[in-house]
Curated annotation (Swiss-Prot):
Organism name: Mycolicibacterium smegmatis (strain ATCC 700084 / mc(2)155)
Keyword match Secreted: yes
Subunit structure: Homotetramer.
Protein name stated in the entry: 3-oxoacyl-[acyl-carrier-protein] reductase MabA
Subcellular location(s) of the protein: Secreted, Cell wall
Catalytic reaction(s) noted: a (3R)-hydroxyacyl-[ACP] + NADP(+) = a 3-oxoacyl-[ACP] + NADPH + H(+); a (3R)-3-hydroxyacyl-CoA + NADP(+) = a 3-oxoacyl-CoA + NADPH + H(+); (3R)-3-hydroxybutanoyl-CoA + NADP(+) = acetoacetyl-CoA + NADPH + H(+); (3R)-hydroxyoctanoyl-CoA + NADP(+) = 3-oxooctanoyl-CoA + NADPH + H(+)
InterPro entries: FAS-II_3-oxoacyl-ACP_reductase, NAD(P)-bd_dom_sf, Sc_DH/Rdtase_CS, SDR, SDR_fam
Length: 255
């Protein structure tokens, strides 16, 4: 295979001991912008069939979009049914949809705490539970949660966000212990300080200060996060289960 070949064009061809590429049905929640969009486009470029969820803003023309609110179990079920009709049962789930509602601990309301947990953690659970139905029947599945360095490091003013992202690690490991024997694995990709619209909007002093905690001394890109997801979605990652892969320039080392 030359460097210009598309993996989809060489499906079924194993090379140098590597397993053959298999095009999978992929769903990326919150895949219409930011890190989620970069992940969706990378997986599509890899040769997979990719659908993305959005909350009403639509999806880019090059991706199949379905409207979904991950805090609503019925909406999650409808979204999965749409994807199944369009490209078959979901074989790779990237649970990326999330929000942040930062506040000092003493000022954080229960409503704000629960809103983030419901979206970032329980929403991921709803999607993973729904995806696991067909994954177990097919005896293949990749569940990839998009976590955060905050879930390991515990960033201040993010009690809700850090708790949700830490919860994804426990959930991935529980799912893997339960379902890996059926060919279904769950892992976490934990981005650090990534160049997105949200981080670019931060005060320049905050941006500069963040680099003090990053050994690589630079901001990461959404495409670098997508690269880690691409690997976990591949046949090469079949023996990886319950792992946390940081994409943070060393920011969360040792946690």
């Amino acid at each position: 295979m030359t460097v210009t070949d598309n993996p989809a064009d060489t499906a079924g061809e194993a090379t140098a001991g590597r397993p053959a590429f298999v095009s999978r049905s992929v769903l990326v929640t919150g895949g219409n912008r930011g890190i989620g969009l970069a992940i969706a486009r990378r997986l599509a470029a890899d040769g997979h069939k990719v659908a993305v969820t959005h909350r009403g803003s639509g999806a880019p023309d090059d991706l199949f979009g379905v409207q979904c609110d991950v805090t609503d179990s019925a909406a999650v079920d409808r979204a999965f049914k749409e994807v199944e009709e369009h490209q078959g049962p979901v074989e790779v789930l990237v649970a990326n949809a999330g929000i942040s509602k930062d506040a000092f601990l003493m000022r954080m309301t229960e409503e704000r705490f629960e809103e983030v947990i419901n979206t970032n953690l329980t929403g991921a659970f709803r999607c993973a539970q729904r995806a696991s139905r067909t994954m177990q029947r097919k005896r293949f599945g990749r569940i990839i949660f998009i976590g955060s360095v905050s879930g390991m490091w515990g960033i201040g003013n993010q009690a809700n966000y850090a708790a949700a992202k830490a919860g994804l690690i426990g959930m991935a490991r529980s799912i893997s212990r339960e379902l890996a024997k059926a060919g279904v694995t769950a892992n976490v990709v934990a981005p650090g300080y990534i160049d997105t619209e949200m981080t670019r909007a931060l005060d320049e002093r905050i941006q500069a200060g963040a680099l003090d905690f990053i050994p690589a001394k630079r901001v990461g890109t959404a495409e670098e996060v997508a690269g880690a997801v691409s690997f976990l979605a591949s046949e090469d990652a079949s023996y990886i289960a319950g792992a946390v892969i940081p994409v943070d320039g060393g920011m969360g080392m040792g946690h």
